[in-house]
Regions:
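Glycine-rich loop(s) and the adjacent beta-strand/alpha-helix scaffold that form part
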Residues: 1-47, 224, 239, 243, ...
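Short, surface-exposed linear patches
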Residues: 8-9, 44-46, 52-56, 86, ...
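A glycine-rich phosphate-binding loop feature that marks nucleotide/adenosyl-phosphate handling sites
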Residues: 48-49, 179-189, 263-268
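A cross-kingdom feature strongest in bacterial/archaeal respiratory oxidoreductases
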Residues: 17, 189, 194-196, 210-247, ...
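Generic detection of long, well-ordered alpha-helical segments
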Residues: 12, 111, 151-162, 237, ...
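A glycine-rich dinucleotide-binding beta-alpha-beta segment and adjacent secondary-structure elements
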Residues: 117-120, 143-230
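FAD cofactor-binding and catalytic pocket of flavoenzymes
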Residues: 15-143, 150, 193, 214-215, ...
Length: 268
């Protein structure tokens, strides 16, 4: 069958687990657009300053944007509830019919980032997707696609996040919003793509070892979020930093490596 690594032939020894066990932090991205006359101006706040745990495995982080981030409005539409790729678009159409004024207000881009509060809804649950390289439909080369893990699929809707957004919208008179792709295609969006070259015991279970060294190769390390094997359920920046620091602590200083090479050359 087709192997997405074959066209480059650059890494023939890399594990077949490459692209498998991709994590999204089990995430859903929502927003609330506050009314124009609100006293609270989120754009003047620190970008990420607070978060809450609605359950032991569900964490909501609140994000604000500066006054120059209005382009992000194009990612959002009216929030809809749970459903499928068939029912969620229908629910969106119903919401547009029931709330035409809110829909028209949501289309106004100017000032969106000054009044918007984003909700990053993250979970530490064991779910995943996979990256798959496939031949292009037209022309040569490959294209990257994603697919759900058949045993532990990634959620397309998180009820706690929707309830939190609805709560804030009701109390402020704002507009609860979800990502357009989620509302129209039942596909969630993540700000934290992780995994795909995860840590494992061997090449059959992962792409890198516990020191982030790629199985089958010498002096090739993976030191970013793609090595993370699980959903932390929170912003992963510090976890990625810690894993990278651990990997770097196993790399000998350049002087020691030079001495080792000279000794090896002398003994041979």
């Amino acid at each position: 069958g087709f192997d997405g690594r074959q066209p480059t032939k650059q890494s023939p020894l890399i594990s077949d687990r490459l692209g498998s066990l991709v994590r999204t932090n089990s995430e859903s991205v929502l927003a609330v657009k506050l009314p124009a006359n609100t006293e609270w101006q989120p754009a003047h706040d620190v970008a990420i300053s607070s978060s809450i745990h609605t359950s032991p495995d569900t964490h909501i982080e609140f994000v604000t944007y500066g006054p120059k981030g209005d382009v992000l409005f194009s990612l959002f539409t009216l929030m809809v509830g749970d459903g499928t790729r068939i029912t969620r678009p229908l629910k969106l159409i119903a919401a547009l019919v029931r709330h035409p004024l809110k829909f028209l207000q949501s289309l106004w881009p100017f000032g969106w980032s000054r009044r918007a509060v984003a909700f990053l809804v993250m979970q530490s649950l064991d779910n995943a997707i996979a990256f798959r390289a496939k031949p292009r439909i037209f022309g040569t080369g490959i294209r990257m696609t994603t697919e759900q893990d058949p045993e532990k699929p990634n959620p397309t809707y998180i009820d706690a996040g929707n309830k939190a957004a609805e709560w804030l919208a009701q109390r402020t008179g704002g507009i609860a919003q979800s990502i357009i792709l989620e509302a129209l295609a039942n596909i969630p969006t993540t700000a934290h793509i992780l995994g795909g070259a995860v840590i494992g015991h061997d090449a059959a279970s992962g792409v890198v070892d516990r020191h982030n060294r790629v199985f089958g190769y010498r002096n090739l390390l993976v030191c970013d979020g793609s090595a993370m094997p699980a959903n932390p359920g929170v912003n992963p920046s510090l976890t990625i930093t810690a894993i990278t620091e651990h990997a770097m602590s196993q790399v000998a200083p350049a002087v020691e490596r030079k001495v080792e090479r000279e000794v090896e050359a002398w003994t041979h």
